[in-house]
Amino acid sequence: MGSEMCIRDRFMSKVEKIAQKYVPAVVSFVFVPTITIFFANVALFTVFGPVGNMIGNGLAAVIDVLYNSFGAFGAFVFAALLQPLVVTGTHQAIQGIEANLIATTGFNYIQGIWSVSIIAQGGGAIGMYLLAKKHSKDRDIAMSSFIPTLVGISEPAIFAANLKYSVIPFVCSCLGAGCGGAFMKLAGVRAIGQGLTGILGLLIVVPNKLVFYVIGNLIAFIVPIVLIVIYNKTKGCLLYTSPS
């Protein structure tokens, strides 16, 4: 249902703008929300529901093929592309796939992939922190955006640090996620639940895979830092602010 809701929310914003344009201001408080919700729900069940279901099924099939047929390489690609899905909002469809995995097999291999993809963005933020020696504001932002990644929230790191001046830190983070994801696949890391990543993910990872889970996340964290520092030294400065 995640992909359907994602599509519906974007449609609702368009309908609301149109309704605000044509509905008289004196009754807009009542009728704009009513019109928006009505047309959005009609579209959800007649158009976006079936389309979103197809997208979700297609995404599930791609993930299954990548992870189970292409081994560590497939896991690398999956992990590397997961946060770009977050940027577009289509990542919500994966939650249903995780629930189905737990229901049918009792385990969730996507949890480890989720974790490394988020932790890698935190690594990217730390990489930017290290570069911002003369930019106190950027250092503060980078550090504060890194902390949420430890408990599974990547958006601050993505938008406040890794995409702020260049796409390079974000790409480096995605590559770090891929490395961590490949390790998770090789180590056979699995969880018995969903929704918890980073430090909190330790609560649901299969006990005999905890050490590998930690190692995979460390790989995902360290690789972006190294790549960002190397890129900055060889290709030029990634920061474009005046010292503060």
Regions found by a protein language model. Name each.
Residues A79-H91, T105, P148-V151, M184:
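Transmembrane alpha-helix interface/packing and boundary motifs in multi-pass membrane proteins
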Residues Q95, A99-S173:
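Helix-loop-helix junctions within the multi-pass membrane cores of secondary transporters/permeases
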Residues K17, A25, F45-N53, V87-H91, ...:
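Transmembrane helix-loop junctions in multipass membrane proteins, especially transporters and channels
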Residues I63-F70, F107, V205-K209:
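Short aromatic-rich membrane-water interface segments that cap or initiate transmembrane helices
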Residues A72, N100, H135-S136, S144, ...:
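Transmembrane alpha-helical segments and their short flanking loops
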Residues G2-I7, Y240-S244:
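Conserved small/polar residues in nucleotide/adenosyl-binding loops
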Residues E16-V86:
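Core mid-bundle transmembrane helix pairs that form the ion/substrate translocation pathway
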